[in-house]
Amino acid sequence: MMRRIIENSHGHPLKNQKILQSKELSCIACSQGKLIIRPSPAKMEVKPPTFLERIHGDICGPINPPSGPFRYFMVLIDASSKWSHVCLLSSRNLAFARLLAQIIKLRAQFPDYTIKNIRVDNAGEFTSQAFNNYCMSTGINIEHPVAHVHTQNCLAESFIKHLQLIARPLLMREKIPLSIWGHAILHAASLIRIRPTSYHKYSPTQLAYGQEPDISHL
């Protein structure tokens, strides 16, 4: 730009020269190169979901090195209380059985609350006919985000990042082998459940069970 001004001026004062306006300087390629993917707009809820009304789930892995026989971990998090369940998996094929077992356990522990919606990714273990048939028989609505649009399941994915941000420093501080990540992830999950969140002044455990969590073991 400065070179063009100098060449066009031929040594004459700039006040006699035409100055290009900003709209004449726009570079389409530069603008396109700086584009970013905006987060998907949050769906406006008429009212906040009740406990267990909406559960988000996701699987992280494969992780190398494995933690014993485990190479994955699965998270389930309640959209209302942020209460969570984390389990280690040796294979993604076990996700359906673990999810089914947790649903049965939650329905037995909290008979006054109904699981209405489960949002999970499009992995084969969550799109199988067996999983669809079970959810249909129990009145659970399955929600799948658009493929490769991770922001549509951001609650589960952000929870996974939260776990990792706690587990990694634990491993580094204690200078223990990375293969112990499974224990670190489970410990991080237990710490998150007993701490108040940015959404509530109470911990997820207190919101779920109605009493303060026991922290005597810490």
Sequence positions of predicted segments:
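HHCC-type zinc-binding knuckle of retroelement integrases
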Residues: 1-218
